[in-house]
Amino acid sequence: MSEIQKEEQETQMFRYKDAFLPIEERVNDLLSHMTLREKVGQLNQRLYGFRAYERKGDEITLTKETIEEAKYFGGLGVVYGLYRADPWSAKTTENGLSKEYAIKGYNLLQRCCLEHSRLGIPLLLSSECPHGHQALDGYLLPVNLAAGATFDPKLYKEAVSVCAHQLKQMGVNLSLVSALDVARDPRWGRTEECFGEDPYLCSCFAKAAVEGTQSEGVAMVAKHFCAQGETTGGVNASAARIGERELREIHLPAAKACCEAGVKGVMAAYNEIDGVYCHMNHHLLTEILRDEFGFDGIVMADGVALDRLQEAVGDEPHAAALALSAGVDVSLWDNVFPVSYTHLTLPTT
């Protein structure tokens, strides 16, 4: 049997491989072939991409942890920050993926994923883009507070599209962009991620960010949803002590503008609103975001937010169930989904 005949036979067996079929039909067929472990693997964004490899001179190798993760889950759903370089990641021009090594590193990781994916599911790559691409040789922009001070969302959109063009060339699928936070307390250490304190101005720039990013074929994940700038005492991730009126008048307009612009992703915020953590807030993530605003993309958790949720509710399976039921689709740096899978599959004696 020739290779072409093999491919045709495989396409007939696995309808999701038929590019001429509607996407929804292909997705449903793919899901029907997946095991529970493979499904959990697709929701799992546990790996730090900048720790997924080691570079010594011109040689790049994947870490044992990365390979084992791909083996166990039959591939990798989403990998965060492959190109990230800053003091936290400890990546520099000496050991990071600067432009001459970027594609080599990406291909190595993607090949590992595909080799261990029984169904040939490629990974998605997400990158931090608070003001341009947070990477070696990444295109950078002024921080949002400075961009907002220009009062020129059209110019900002053009600048963002240039950054997105580079992201596309580097294989990035999801650009994580701070676009939803409103400056409410200058003591908050992340105020520079806000476009300003005016909901209308923030909405205009949020819309520009979506249009600029997605014009280049890169999906944008707008963050953080919602009211993260409404901190108590300026403390990051603290409770937002607001009611429904302030939520809707101040903090939701930017999210609504993003949804109207067709944003593909939204990241939930660390904080709680009126005593309910955003990551388990069904009213926020489903009733408002999806039902009211018409959002039909993915909701991503913020970093280790589901692990923090586990600390609040008692155990991993409970945290996973609350997050998934509320509307969270993909984790970030968490152990909640993998640990919950282990609990679900333990033999009962």
Name what the model sees in each region.
Residues T345-T349:
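A short, hydrophobic C-terminal helix/tail in secreted or cell-surface proteins
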Residues S2-L344:
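Glycoside hydrolase catalytic-domain context in secreted enzymes
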